Amino acid sequence: MLYRYGKDNNGRPVKKAVVYTREEHLIPAYKIDPDAFKIVQRLKDNGYTAYIVGGAVRDLLIGKTPKDFDIVTDATPSKIKRIFRNSRIIGRRFRLVHVIFGLKIFEVSTFRSTIDGSVGNSFGTIDEDVMRRDFTINALYYDPILEQVIDYVGGVRDI
């Protein structure tokens, strides 16, 4: 088990998240949709952070095949659109991108923040994004390249 650290107000390191390795989470690579993998890979190749998030991670951890794969990144919708020609920006309150592969649509959103109390396009960090998710089991992030589950809020324990 690994840990992800941040800093407190005094600059001291504080544990922020538990990182589960492939040997610990046992998610088989073949259960990851190859197009979802490509989206994460291409975002990373362009210098962005990207993860599979939410219900797909929960389903993978309990041995189910997810019905859809949502992806979250630090790239803004306009940057995502530039990387994927096969995409369209949707939404009024919070803009996100649908990336289309054949008949499959992948929802790619930017990390969101609720720090200022807004519900619209308030982009944030992964630390802020995790706090706005509905349940701990839907606040799990999976990096399919490194094969790591990142858990900020005890979602793995709650499963």
What is each stretch, according to the model?
Residues 1-159:
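Catalytic cores of the polymerase beta-like nucleotidyltransferase superfamily
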